Curated annotation (Swiss-Prot):
(6S)-5,6,7,8-tetrahydrofolate binds at L121, G125, H126, L127, S355, P356, F357. Keywords: Amino-acid biosynthesis, Cytoplasm, One-carbon metabolism, Pyridoxal phosphate, Transferase. Catalyzes the reversible interconversion of serine and glycine with tetrahydrofolate (THF) serving as the one-carbon carrier. This reaction serves as the major source of one-carbon groups required for the biosynthesis of purines, thymidylate, methionine, and other important biomolecules. Also exhibits THF-independent aldolase activity toward beta-hydroxyamino acids, producing glycine and aldehydes, via a retro-aldol mechanism. GO terms for cellular component: cytosol. It comes from Pseudomonas syringae pv. syringae (strain B728a). Belongs to the SHMT family. This is Serine hydroxymethyltransferase 2. Homodimer. The modification N6-(pyridoxal phosphate)lysine is found at K230. The gene is glyA2. It is an enzyme of class 2 (transferase). Its main location: cytoplasm. The record marks H229 as: Plays an important role in substrate specificity.
């Protein structure tokens, strides 16, 4: 029998030490990884609840286990809130991750070997958009489009040319490292021209979409997926959305369960319900606008300091800095910034001469620092510190000076007050 007073402390101190160290790292380091954010204590409360004990294979009102009357209410709340938040007719809140949501879409709409057209990973796409190392590139005939390296923008005429030539069954619009706004009407027109499904992966910009600050793909796409963390600030998980289409809804549901998953994680679904409610609060739009303002201000600092920002700037929460002209690698830059307690991620850039493990770029995002309370003033200062380190790569004195300034800034803006 378990006691309500059971604690990790005193029982598993080795684990607790690692957990506490990570929480302290989050407080002491500035987080600029575009896919990371801080979630609320309300979300954590739901995710750490007794709902983790309940198996609930199936869907609300149609389960394969008894005792699901209460978790049915939890899942239905999450579904209704997701639909309301994004203006969708259909929502599946069960995918354990964005990649599993994407896998369910493939399973629902395609046969193995079908042709899909997605954005190249090297140009800002995602692994699940047809990369050779992913299921999407192994099980399907994946054709890739990219950006015009002269402009840093997607060349929609080229996307259309490839689509006409290759006749994909599904076209994927979405990214993990593209800083400009996608033209969903143009993607829809291209898909219609070749008779393809249009699948939009909005994982990175879902929070901006929810706030009305980025175009909503729902009116144009046959199906939309997203993660529930990143700009949404919820638990790590996935979500599938669509307009009303009974045939497709059945396919999506079957592709998630039993096609790709067994029991849903009811504690995570509860946490998703919390984050959807939080995203409907009035302050959420102001937060997302600040995310964009901060990213644009930081990108301009890099441009002013002589660095190449891919696509010339940003419309969203992230941007890519190319270090090719400086002769630096993303790996070395990432490590140097880490020593100064600034966390970014190395990232491939167009025409990158380095391997994906080394790269010639950095991806920088502002969701986490904005949650922390940073405004444009702090982000401009922060971008300047990063440029100082890049201009003096490997200089321990510069790293130490920046680290001390980072410590002071983090103390002024704690993650959890």
């Amino acid at each position: 029998m378990f006691s309500k007073q059971d604690q990790i402390q005193g029982y598993d101190d080795a684990l607790l030490s690692a957990m506490n160290a990570e929480e302290q790292r989050q407080e002491d380091h500035i987080e600029l990884i575009a896919s990371e954010n801080y979630t609320s204590k309300r979300v954590m409360q739901a995710q750490g609840s007794g709902l983790t004990n309940k198996y609930a294979e199936g869907y609300p009102g149609k389960r394969y286990y008894g005792g699901c009357e209460h978790v049915d209410k939890v899942e239905q709340l999450a579904i209704e809130r997701a639909r309301q938040l994004f203006g969708a007719d259909y929502a599946n809140v069960q995918p354990h991750s964005g990649s599993q949501a994407n896998a369910a879409v493939y399973l629902a709409l395609l046969q193995a070997g079908d042709t899909v057209l997605g954005m190249s990973l090297a140009h800002g796409g995602h692994l699940t958009h047809g990369a050779k190392v992913s299921f999407s590139g192994k099980l399907y005939n994946a054709v890739q489009y990219g950006i015009d390296t002269a402009t840093g923008l997607i060349d929609y005429d080229e996307v259309e040319r490839i689509a006409v030539e290759c006749q994909p069954k599904m076209i994927i619009a979405g990214f993990s490292a593209y800083s400009k706004t996608l033209d969903f009407p143009r993607f829809r027109a291209i898909a219609d021209k070749v008779g393809a499904y249009l699948f939009v992966d909005m994982a990175h910009v879902a929070g901006l979409v929810a706030a009305g600050l980025y175009p909503n793909p729902l009116p144009y796409a046959d199906v939309v997926t997203t993660t529930t963390h990143k700009t949404l600030r919820g638990p790590r998980g996935g979500l599938i959305l669509a307009r009303a289409n009974e045939e497709l809804e059945k396919k999506f549901n079957s592709a998630v369960f039993p096609g790709g998953q067994g029991g849903p994680l009811m504690h995570v679904i509860a946490a998703k319900a919390v984050c959807f409610k939080e995203a409907m609060e009035p302050g959420f739009k102001a937060y997302q606008q600040q995310v964009i303002d901060n990213a644009q201000a930081m990108a301009q600092v890099f441009i002013d300091r002589g660095f190449d920002v891919v696509s010339g700037g940003t419309d969203n929460h992230l941007f890519l800095v190319s270090l090719i002209r400086q002769g630096l690698t993303g790996k070395d830059a990432d490590a140097a910034l880490g020593r100064a307690h600034i966390t970014v991620n190395k990232n491939s850039v167009p025409n990158d001469p380095q391997s994906p493990f080394v790269t010639s770029g950095l991806r920088i995002g502002t969701p986490a620092v904005t949650t922390r309370g940073f405004k444009v003033t702090q982000c401009v200062e922060l971008a300047g510190w990063i440029c100082d380190i890049l201009d003096n790569l490997g200089d321990a004195d510069v790293e130490a000076d920046v680290a001390s300034q980072v410590a002071a800034l983090c103390a002024d803006f704690p993650v959890y007050r």
